[in-house]
Amino acid sequence: MEVNRLAYLTAMGSLRPPSPNGDWSKPQDAPHKSVIDMMASGVSHIKVLKVDIDAQHLCVCLPHNMLTCCHPAVDMENLLGSGSFGKVYASGPGICAKVFTSAEAFYHETVMMDLVALARSYNCDDFKSVCLQFYLSACVTCKTIWYPRFSQSLHTFKDFTVDHLHDLDREFKGLTDAVFFLNQKCGLFHGDICPSNILVETFKGPGSGIKSLILTDLGTAAIHAGNTFKSLSINNPQDDSVIYNAQIYLSPFLVCKDYVKPLCVLRRCYLLRHHAQDVDVEEITDTVVGQNMALKIDCSTLLQVLLLVLARVMEQPNSLTYESWLREIEDDSSDAYFLLLLGPKLVLLTHLSQLWEINFDVGVNTQGVLSRGQLPHPHTRLLKECCQLFREEFDAVVKEEVLIKLGQGVLKNIIFELLQFDYFEIHGRQPQHGLFAQSHAARADSEHGNWRTS
């Protein structure tokens, strides 16, 4: 029994494709030719030193221009921001410099950004990368990468109004294209899409609209399993010694910020914690994520960011009720923690269902009832109570003018598109999971047992 439980936890913690004979079935990774594959037969920004077909591994070296300090000066007196791996300073006109405290973090982000640059060069006619950040240069000696400069991100941009809805509709379609480009043409899984990692460019003038949203920060991006070559290292061309292995350890707990974790990842985390007993499930990690799973998680996380931003638009100024609920939940060591994160997301989706007179099926409803299977009774009651409490607070701060605008269908298509990926099951939405509940089913917030199968 103990062996079976450990096998279950290990399988639940892994995001890689299952073995052909395994029980964890899901759609196979789609064949494509990504930038990782193309690097094996050409020389570009990063030069290929050695190809190990059996190990599915590439050895590369950095180009000469990254090894010399021929770049704009960094204004160390003008700090723009800071993060886990370094700080961002002003540099030349219109650019900024990200100075890393860790050589490993610098190498990783440099390689990921150069792969994106390579993909762009190989796909000149593909404009899906317009909303994906590009880098200007990098210096190994200074452990610094130069980027175009933006004044704010979705995390710091708080002055949303109903007039921004059309901008959000347009730009999140562009961000969705960027995720597809990253997945299909770059062979990468972002894994950390959040408001802080989406930059904002506004039109000039007070109360101006959003000109563009840009997906950035590949500091924890990973090479997904859809590539022919699934790992990569930076080697010294003189003696072939390994300088850095571009490898990220993945688990459902490490993927995405908790407050924007999609439903499929919340489900995995919940099950891992629920069945853990004395096993440290956070130590169960893997180094490969399947291509389809990578796309599902990134698109589903993008949906959660959109819902969070939409909640800012819907709420009275300075309320941030939706965001506060998600950020202030305590005791992340329990399985119930992941159900409490689920509550506000379900309530907001229910609001949209009612506005558009459509019954979304996301695998669970605000009554704590699953489309397939069931939660333990105490957890059903907990999720139901969480949804009720949040709805009471949220309804009190929602602006009527926004509901009217949303009722006209703004954001409807992009939310439908992103909902195609997420579902409260470990592999996300699959072909048998319809986007909408059956026409005769009860509303998502009604008192009903199983609104999808009853």
UniProtKB/Swiss-Prot annotation:
Example GO molecular function: non-membrane spanning protein tyrosine kinase activity
Catalytic reaction annotation: L-tyrosyl-[protein] + ATP = O-phospho-L-tyrosyl-[protein] + ADP + H(+)
Family the entry assigns: Belongs to the protein kinase superfamily. Tyr protein kinase family.
Binding positions for ATP per the UniProt entry: L80, G81, S82, G83, S84, F85, G86, K87, V88, K98
High-level lineage: Viruses, Duplodnaviria, Heunggongvirae, Peploviricota, Herviviricetes
Protein name stated in the entry: Putative tyrosine kinase 36
EC number: 2.7.10.2
UniProt source species: Alcelaphine herpesvirus 1 (strain C500)
Active site per database record: D192 (proton acceptor)
SUPFAM superfamilies: Protein kinase-like (PK-like) (SSF56112)
Keywords for this protein: ATP-binding, Kinase, Nucleotide-binding, Transferase, Tyrosine-protein kinase
